[in-house]
């Protein structure tokens, strides 16, 4: 911000901020005077020293309206400058904004521009940092003008000379010194900042730019081009920031009226020499204060010390120059001055940083004051402390309403004190503010009455740290309570993630009218019932409330009054109060309204009415069928008393899941007000009946099933069988491990199911443990398994922090917690439990950092327009596999989106949703149930084409209000919160399982999902006999081809219902054309290894398989069986030698039919020369299955890896074209894979030896198919399949981690917002005639604008007889040249020859979120994120302008954010009345908006 002499800082309305390098003139213009002395304050008077670092004359008075000497006191002398001490009479606040300066004796280089990477000064002068350093620190001279002596000696400009060389020339050519400095014949060489200043001043940037562009075009050397490009970037930055500003032309002179004379321009902006400082600015003294401590000492800011060093050295140097000290001494002093200024600007970069005397820590320089969490940006500008706030412990307030909170009186009186004082004075209870304060301190009873009136209708904000999403701050209506703890409504705990074990919360008071309106309309807790991350309700009853509702609505056979018929609901309640009917009794009630129920009510009549009352039975059945009588329980009638009429009668057992669905349904049907009322009612009912039920658990409630012993015996027998197989040599160690783990996993699940069933049947389902579990109040099946079944397998904690899963210990814990564990079992289980606790603390920080990066990358994504008009969309298909494996349903993916094209039911050929329509919850549910709709094209943020922000049609509905998103919604921040919040939650929840392993049982059988007809596609199978476990020989069909497919088709329509990929080596159980029923086994496969099978009969022949070289033989000491495993053979051979282990199938004559390469780690199953039948296993490649589930420790690093777009550790090699695979030559460390297509295009890939190749000779592959195993790199997907594919890949992969690892629901649109930001940039390939540079990383929008700018321009090839201002090779507007040509033709002169201007080309770039946040268009936002000094240096050099478009930069400069109610279009709103009489107008910028928002 600019202050000029005598003015105050700009406080007015500004819309953008420009960054540039400060010129000496601008530093002087900001300054109020020169600081000449290093002193701060006088040690006796404690008053600032004149001309010192705290001088009142320069920086302003230390006391309001009082000069230094005391001649002028009081405000009436405002603005007078004292004639005695020279201090202006004004407020002391000016000491926060007035600056001073230090005039340096010699120019000094600014360390930021010299030490930044790449060095800005180095790039302009074409000098390395090392050479620059030697010049700047007075080690060598640099030639500025070689002159005549230089020519004779062969010295050029920019050459470095040592002291000896310099003095040799000086003494040799003595008369040279007599020449003028600007004489071209004079030899001039200098050192230090002065030399750099002179060199920079003499640069011709335009000439350098032309030469560098020439190198770029013509040079063949890649290195030269890279260097030229690096330099050109800096040169162009200076040229762009130093553009002429055209003045208004008074009158034209000269013969050519169209010629522009150079005087008509003023140049402003950066000059290279500004990077060398002649004047150092001194920041205001209040920003580097001196604070008196007790004991008469002072604590000072480090900056004062650093400034002192500069002033002392500068004054000493001036004195030395005056007394004409020897050059050696001067040079040393100049170097010390340079170092002092370096330390002032950036002390942390230096190896020999200036340290403090006592504690020996480096002093904090100006750079350190900006950087990091404690720096100016993050500490003071983004996070401020707030007045009118307090904090206290929270306790539960069960009798509060949803929008209320209990505020302790002592806290309220403190927070609302000014308002109370005002009321007391207004009412005349107190005479003055002072007496009102006394009344408050005495706690006079009248004060409480006034306080009650003051807080009426005034909301307060409650916040619990950490505030991970927007529901972490909500508004409540305070009610005054005794005590010192804040009371919180139990239903808002989930949103705050609060519990009552000592948590604290902060209270804030919104002061202005606008803030109060926003708090009550937008932030009130009863308006925030839905989670923005998934659209699901967040105010869901839990624990006691759920238990109470469950107990109330549960039926018990044989309760008092069972089978009675009641005339009305009221009658039921009377009967219950009179104890004629029990709470759980099943009864009949006359009711003909809407009913939501699960069970078949007619069937219940036979159970409830005795056989002898046959007529009554028949009558009741007919009444029930006519929907006139309802079968329900007394408890359900009581529960439904609180139900809104519109919803009808809920005749279900209410558990947590049902309650959640019910609340979601209510909020969409009847709105927030009634839903909030209902929530308060069921809260009371829940707590009430939990108390009446009196549920508690004892040891006897945990029942261990008797069958447990039998199951464990079976498991022990099965695992012994596996060990026997292993001993026989038919299984590898890896397979043995996997199978044993499977056996125990199955047993554990079996015992768990039986113990669960046992609990369910105990006491008619009224076992307290079972009720807690079944209602969803507390506990999980997993915990019941550990309590009453067996603890099962335990995960061994992982050793690395990189997120690889730990192994499962194959010996399970057979005991459960009721029986008690043995010492060994206890030891094993402590292993996992401790890991959970340590993980929590380590990973919370990681999750928090992820959230911060997400916020930074997406903070400027705001809904700016209604419709961008794009025709593109996202293609979504129904995927049965994902839906059955518990992933996101088709319905969830399309819900709340706008259809990009008509969604059609292909069976009936009718349009279900028209293009441009919103797919509501009802429409989405209908589409889910309609098999005719297989796919849909929806509008998405990923394809939105708006230039700034996004459009509301592409985003779809706002999940928390189920309406199309409004203009100004900060969807980027909501996306970041929605992804970051569960990440943090997940890491905090790992230890609840107690470390028990939950990995999936490896599924070997694939079953039919639909009934239909089998169609086999590319499935080649052979008959193969195998010996089963029982020793019986069986014939099976084994698939010997890769990538075969099995389709299930509808026999009537021929439509494919489901596709399955049949793996290589699978046993197939069905034939082509066979009809199958649902759940019939189609094929089974071995999940633990990849098999290599013989496809034809013949004999095995080993090629390059040599014992001790390419394979090792391991003999099992117990079994004597030898296992052959291929090993990494490279270390065993000389550099020239190479091997490629493979097994060939040969005919009897020895002719090779087919060869199979065998990768490292594979186990051989045949001997050399063995006879083979089709389907025989030649070798197996073991797979590592990730079995440890339920722990996001593995998930969080994965999410980070995806968001940072990192290349995986061992990526797959991916084919870039469609074609056929062939293998080329083999080198020592790699082999060649070629992919060739029918058009003659060929790509060659080199695969490291030992990596498993998935493709075989002759395989057909598609572009993007992996040729080797490993994870596919997102960068490869972008390069080969384009931006759309990589966007879909990232969204799906991240979604998988959250879904599978943690069961957290996040709507796709949030992930899409982040992924969109990762693909915002393009890299320029060819710059064409635009002002871009090749290799530039720029915004897509900037790139399009640059191309549009040259679209209508032409380049002049031959100027013909054009006026002098038309130059060859330059760009001009087409219409101007056409006009000139017309005139030239008229005058029979030769015309101008032109060609169209070339446009730039580019390719999209995928950036990780950290890089994307640093590459943001906003300088302020990037600087506050990371690498502050680098960002500011680059911005200053390029003269960047921050347009303040995002949220962060506006918060930093103290403006309203351009989102929500702070949108610019709302700023000028005024409320006015149409009534004729006068009304008070609320002068507000956001009263109207708050209503518009709602």
From Swiss-Prot:
Binding-site residues, Zn(2+) 1: 67, 69, 82, 85
UniProt-annotated binding residues for Mg(2+): 499, 501, 503
Q: Which cofactor does it need?
A: Mg(2+); Zn(2+)
Which amino acid positions bind Zn(2+) 2, per UniProt?
868, 944, 951, 954
Gene3D superfamilies xrefs: 1.10.132.30, 1.10.150.390, 1.10.1790.20, 1.10.40.90, 2.40.40.20, 2.40.50.100, RNA polymerase II, clamp domain, RNA polymerase Rpb1, domain 3
- Entry annotated with the keyword Magnesium: yes
* GO annotation, biological process: DNA-templated transcription
Q: Which Pfam families match?
A: RNA_pol_Rpb1_1, RNA_pol_Rpb1_2, RNA_pol_Rpb1_3, RNA_pol_Rpb1_4, RNA_pol_Rpb1_5
Source organism superkingdom: Bacteria
For this chain, one GO molecular function annotation is:
magnesium ion binding
Q: According to the UniProt record, what class of enzyme is this? A: transferase
> Its GO CC terms?
DNA-directed RNA polymerase complex
SUPFAM superfamilies on file: beta and beta-prime subunits of DNA dependent RNA-polymerase (SSF64484)
Q: How is the cofactor bound?
A: Binds 1 Mg(2+) ion per subunit.
Q: What is its EC number?
A: 2.7.7.6
Q: Which keywords does this chain's UniProt record carry?
A: DNA-directed RNA polymerase, Magnesium, Metal-binding, Nucleotidyltransferase, Transcription, Transferase, Zinc
Primary role: DNA-dependent RNA polymerase catalyzes the transcription of DNA into RNA using the four ribonucleoside triphosphates as substrates.
Q: Which NCBIfam families match?
A: rpoC_TIGR
What family, per the record?
A: Belongs to the RNA polymerase beta' chain family.
The name this protein goes by in its record = DNA-directed RNA polymerase subunit beta'
What organism does this protein naturally occur in? Chlorobaculum parvum (strain DSM 263 / NCIMB 8327) (Chlorobium vibrioforme subsp. thiosulfatophilum)
Its gene is rpoC
């Amino acid at each position: 911000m600019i202050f000029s002499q005598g003015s105050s800082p700009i406080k007015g309305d500004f819309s953008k901020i420009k960054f540039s390098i400060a010129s000496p003139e601008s530093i002087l213009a900001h300054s109020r005077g020169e600081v000449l002395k290093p002193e701060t304050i006088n040690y006796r008077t404690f008053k600032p020293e004149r001309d010192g670092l705290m001088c009142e004359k320069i920086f302003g008075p230390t006391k309001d309206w009082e000069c230094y000497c005391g001649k002028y006191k009081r405000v009436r002398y405002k603005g007078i400058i004292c004639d005695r001490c020279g201090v202006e009479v004004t407020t002391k606040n000016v000491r926060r904004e007035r600056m001073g300066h230090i005039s340096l004796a010699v120019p000094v280089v600014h360390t930021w521009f010299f030490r930044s990477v790449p060095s800005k000064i180095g790039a302009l002068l074409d000098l390395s940092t090392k050479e620059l350093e030697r010049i700047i620190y007075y080690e060598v001279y640099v030639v500025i003008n070689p002159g005549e002596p230089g020519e004779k000696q062969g010295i050029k400009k920019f050459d470095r000379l040592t002291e000896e060389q310099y003095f040799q020339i000086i003494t040799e050519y003595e008369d040279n010194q007599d020449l003028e400095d600007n004489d071209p014949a004079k030899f001039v060489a200098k050192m230090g900042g002065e030399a750099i200043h002179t060199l920079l001043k003499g640069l011709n940037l335009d000439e350098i730019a032309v030469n560098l562009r020439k190198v770029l075009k013509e040079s063949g050397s890649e290195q030269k081009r890279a260097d030229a490009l690096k330099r050109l970037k800096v040169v162009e930055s200076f040229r762009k920031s130093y553009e002429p500003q055209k003045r208004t032309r008074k009158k034209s002179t000269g013969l050519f009226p169209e010629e522009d004379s150079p005087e008509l321009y003023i140049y402003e902006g950066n000059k290279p020499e500004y990077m060398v400082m002649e004047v150092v600015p001194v920041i205001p003294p209040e920003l580097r204060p001196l604070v008196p401590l007790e004991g008469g000492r002072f604590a000072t800011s480090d900056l004062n010390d650093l400034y002192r060093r500069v002033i002392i050295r500068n004054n000493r140097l001036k004195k030395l120059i005056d007394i004409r000290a020897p050059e050696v001494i001067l040079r040393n002093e100049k170097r010390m001055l340079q170092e002092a200024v370096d330390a002032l600007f950036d002390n942390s970069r230096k190896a020999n940083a200036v340290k403090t005397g006592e504690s020996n820590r480096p002093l904090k320089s100006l750079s350190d004051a900006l950087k990091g969490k404690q720096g100016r940006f993050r500490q003071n500008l983004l996070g401020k402390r707030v007045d009118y706030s307090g904090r206290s412990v929270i306790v539960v307030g069960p009798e509060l309403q949803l929008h209320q909170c209990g505020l302790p009186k002592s806290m309220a009186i403190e927070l609302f004190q000014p308002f109370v004082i005002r009321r007391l004075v207004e009412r005349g209870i107190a005479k003055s503010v002072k007496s009102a304060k006394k009344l408050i301190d005495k706690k006079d009873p009248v004060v409480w009455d006034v306080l009650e009136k003051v807080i009426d209708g005034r909301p307060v904000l409650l916040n619990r740290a950490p505030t991970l999403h927007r529901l972490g701050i909500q508004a409540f209506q305070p009610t005054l309570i005794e005590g010192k703890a804040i009371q919180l409504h139990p239903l808002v705990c989930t949103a705050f993630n609060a519990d009552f074990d000592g948590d604290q919360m902060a209270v804030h008071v919104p002061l202005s009218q606008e803030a109060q309106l926003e708090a009550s309309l937008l932030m009130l807790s009863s308006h925030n019932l839905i989670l923005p991350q998934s659209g699901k309700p967040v105010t869901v009853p839990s624990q006691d409330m759920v238990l109470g509702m469950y107990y109330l609505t549960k039926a018990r056979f044989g309760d008092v009054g069972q089978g009675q018929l009641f005339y009305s609901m009221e009658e039921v309640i009377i009967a219950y109060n009179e104890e004629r009917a029990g709470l759980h009794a099943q009864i009949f009630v006359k009711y003909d309204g809407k009913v939501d129920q699960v069970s078949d009510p007619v069937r219940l009549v036979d159970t409830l009415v005795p056989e002898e009352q046959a007529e009554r039975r028949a009558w009741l059945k007919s009444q029930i069928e006519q929907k006139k009588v309802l079968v329900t329980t007394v408890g359900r009638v009581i529960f439904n008393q609180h139900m809104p009429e519109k919803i009808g009668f809920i005749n279900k057992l209410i558990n947590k899941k049902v309650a959640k669905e019910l609340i979601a349904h209510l909020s969409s049907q009847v709105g927030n007000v009634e839903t909030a009322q209902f929530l308060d009612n069921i809260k009371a009912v829940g707590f009430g009946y939990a108390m009446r039920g009196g549920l508690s658990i004892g040891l006897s409630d945990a029942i261990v099933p008797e069958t447990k012993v039998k199951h464990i015996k079976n498991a022990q027998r099965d695992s012994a069988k596996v060990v026997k197989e292993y001993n026989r040599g038919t299984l590898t160690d890896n397979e043995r491990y996997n199978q044993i783990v499977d056996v125990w996993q199955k047993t554990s699940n079996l015992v768990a199911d039986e113990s669960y069933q046992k609990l369910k049947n105990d006491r008619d389902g009224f076992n307290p443990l079972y009720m807690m579990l079944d209602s969803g109040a507390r506990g999980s099946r997993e915990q019941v398994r550990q309590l009453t079944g067996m603890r099962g397998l335990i995960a061994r904690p992982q050793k690395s922090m990189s997120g690889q899963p730990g192994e499962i210990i194959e010996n399970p814990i057979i005991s459960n917690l009721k029986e008690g564990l043995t010492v060994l079992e206890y030891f094993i289980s402590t292993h996992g439990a401790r890991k959970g606790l340590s993980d929590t603390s380590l990973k919370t920080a990681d999750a928090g950092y992820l959230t911060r990066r997400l916020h930074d990358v997406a903070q400027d994504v705001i809904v700016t327009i209604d419709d961008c008009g794009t025709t593109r969309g996202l293609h979504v298909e129904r995927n049965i596999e994902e839906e059955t494996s518990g992933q996101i349903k088709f319905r969830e993916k399309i819900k709340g989106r706008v259809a990009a094209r008509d969604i059609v039911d292909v069976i009936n050929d009718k349009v279900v949703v028209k293009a441009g329509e919103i797919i509501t919850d009802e429409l989405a549910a209908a589409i889910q149930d309609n098999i005719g709709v297989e796919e849909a094209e929806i509008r998405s943020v990923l394809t939105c084409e708006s230039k700034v922000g996004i459009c509301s049609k592409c985003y779809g509905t706002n999940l928390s209000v189920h309406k199309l998103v409004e203009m100004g919604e900060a969807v980027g921040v909501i996306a970041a919160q929605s992804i970051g919040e569960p990440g943090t939650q997940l890491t905090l929840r790992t230890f609840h399982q107690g470390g028990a392993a939950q990995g999936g049982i490896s599924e070997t059988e694939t079953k039919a999902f639909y009934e239909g007809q089998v169609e086999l596609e590319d499935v080649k199978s052979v008959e193969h006999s195998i010996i089963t476990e029982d020793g019986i020989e069986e014939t099976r069909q084994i698939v010997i081809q890769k990538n075969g497919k099995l389709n299930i088709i509808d026999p009537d329509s021929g439509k494919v219902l489901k596709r399955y990929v049949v793996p290589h080596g699978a046993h197939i159980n069905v034939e082509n054309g066979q009809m199958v029923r649902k759940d019939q086994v189609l094929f089974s496969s071995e999940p633990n290894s990849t098999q290599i099978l013989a496809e034809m009969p013949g004999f095995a022949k080993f090629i390059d398989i040599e014992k001790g070289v390419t394979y090792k033989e391991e003999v099992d000491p117990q079994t004597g069986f030898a296992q052959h495993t291929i090993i990494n053979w490279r270390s065993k051979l000389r550099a020239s030698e190479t091997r490629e282990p493979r097994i060939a199938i040969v005919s009897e004559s020895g002719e090779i039919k087919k060869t199979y390469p065998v990768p490292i780690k594979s186990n051989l199953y045949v001997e050399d020369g063995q006879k083979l039948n089709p389907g025989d296993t030649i070798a197996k490649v073991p797979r590592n299955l990730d079995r440890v589930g339920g722990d996001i420790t593995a998930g969080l690093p994965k999410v980070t890896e995806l968001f940072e777009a990192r290349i995986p550790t061992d990526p797959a090699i991916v084919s870039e074209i469609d074609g056929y695979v062939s293998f080329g030559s083999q080198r020592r460390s790699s082999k060649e894979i070629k992919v060739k297509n029918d058009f003659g295009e060929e790509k060659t890939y080199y695969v490291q030896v030992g990596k498993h190749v998935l493709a075989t000779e002759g395989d057909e592959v598609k572009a993007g198919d992996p040729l080797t195993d490993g994870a596919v790199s997102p960068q490869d997907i972008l390069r080969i399949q384009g931006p759309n594919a990589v966007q879909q890949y990232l969204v799906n992969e991240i979604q998988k981690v959250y879904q599978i690892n943690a069961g957290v629901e996040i709507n796709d649109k949030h992930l899409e917002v982040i992924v969109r930001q990762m693909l915002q940039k393009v890299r320029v390939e060819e710059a064409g005639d635009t002002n871009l540079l090749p290799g530039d990383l720029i915004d897509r929008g900037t790139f399009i604008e640059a191309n549009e700018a040259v679209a209508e321009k032409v380049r002049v090839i031959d100027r013909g007889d054009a006026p002098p201002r038309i130059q060859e090779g330059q760009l001009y507007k087409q219409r101007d040249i056409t006009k000139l040509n017309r005139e030239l033709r008229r005058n029979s002169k030769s015309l101008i020859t032109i060609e169209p201007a070339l446009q730039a080309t580019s390719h999209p770039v995928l950036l990780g979120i950290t890089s994307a946040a640093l590459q943001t268009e906003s300088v302020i936002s990037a600087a506050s994120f990371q690498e502050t000094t680098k960002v500011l240096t680059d911005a200053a050099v390029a003269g960047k302008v921050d347009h303040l478009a995002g949220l962060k930069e506006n918060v930093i400069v103290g403006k309203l954010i351009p989102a929500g109610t702070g949108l610019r279009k709302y700023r000028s709103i005024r409320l006015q009345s149409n009534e004729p009489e006068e009304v008070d107008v609320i002068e507000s910028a956001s009263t109207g908006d708050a209503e518009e928002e709602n």
